[in-house]
Amino acid sequence: MSSGGKGKASSETKSSSRSSKAGLQFPVGRIHRLLKKGNYAQRIGSGAPVYLAAVLEYLAAEILELAGNAARDNKKSRIVPRHLQLAVRNDEELNKLLGSVVISQGGVLPHIMAELLPVKTKGKAKASQEV
């Protein structure tokens, strides 16, 4: 019996997800379902969830890369919320995007105002150089 077309019969074809077709790790189908369920618009185009999944995947990869660098700088092999906080707050664009976001257990950025630091006197510096 002929399948009516070229290639394999419809029962033999291997199905592939929209995420794999787009080369993404984030779930395109789930994002599409959530967009429809959220009543953001009456209709959701087929390209919208692919684009949104790509943007979310890029942001996640960017934050995780910076957080991994922060963890490595602190000689740790596990990313904790503190590393996420340091990564986001030290990056200008991510800090602007997530400026109003509070990261639980993230702590604060270390900063001491210049006025609060001890004053270095020139007399002590000269005395130490002469000895």
Swiss-Prot record:
Keywords: Acetylation, Chromosome, DNA damage, DNA repair, DNA-binding, Methylation, Nucleosome core, Nucleus, Phosphoprotein. GO terms for molecular function: DNA binding; protein heterodimerization activity; structural constituent of chromatin. Signal peptide: none annotated. GO terms for cellular component: nucleosome; nucleus. SMART domains: H2A. A motif ([ST]-Q motif) lies at residues 128-129. Residues 8-23 have a biased composition (Low complexity). GO terms for biological process: DNA repair; heterochromatin formation. Residues 1-24 are annotated as: Disordered. The modification N5-methylglutamine is found at Q105. The modification N6-acetyllysine is found at K6, K8. The modification Phosphoserine is found at S128. It is found in: Nucleus; Chromosome. Pfam families: Histone (PF00125), Histone_H2A_C (PF16211). Its main location: nucleus. PROSITE patterns: HISTONE_H2A. Phosphorylated to form H2AS128ph (gamma-H2A) in response to DNA double-strand breaks (DSBs) generated by exogenous genotoxic agents and by stalled replication forks. Phosphorylation is dependent on the DNA damage checkpoint kinases MEC1/ATR and TEL1/ATM, spreads on either side of a detected DSB site and may mark the surrounding chromatin for recruitment of proteins required for DNA damage signaling and repair. Gamma-H2A is removed from the DNA prior to the strand invasion-primer extension step of the repair process and subsequently dephosphorylated. Core component of nucleosome which plays a central role in DNA double strand break (DSB) repair. Nucleosomes wrap and compact DNA into chromatin, limiting DNA accessibility to the cellular machineries which require DNA as a template. Histones thereby play a central role in transcription regulation, DNA repair, DNA replication and chromosomal stability. DNA accessibility is regulated via a complex set of post-translational modifications of histones, also called histone code, and nucleosome remodeling. In contrast to vertebrates and insects, its C-terminus is not monoubiquitinated. Belongs to the histone H2A family. The [ST]-Q motif constitutes a recognition sequence for kinases from the PI3/PI4-kinase family. The nucleosome is a histone octamer containing two molecules each of H2A, H2B, H3 and H4 assembled in one H3-H4 heterotetramer and two H2A-H2B heterodimers. The octamer wraps approximately 147 bp of DNA. This is Histone H2A. It comes from Cryptococcus neoformans var. neoformans serotype D (strain JEC21 / ATCC MYA-565).
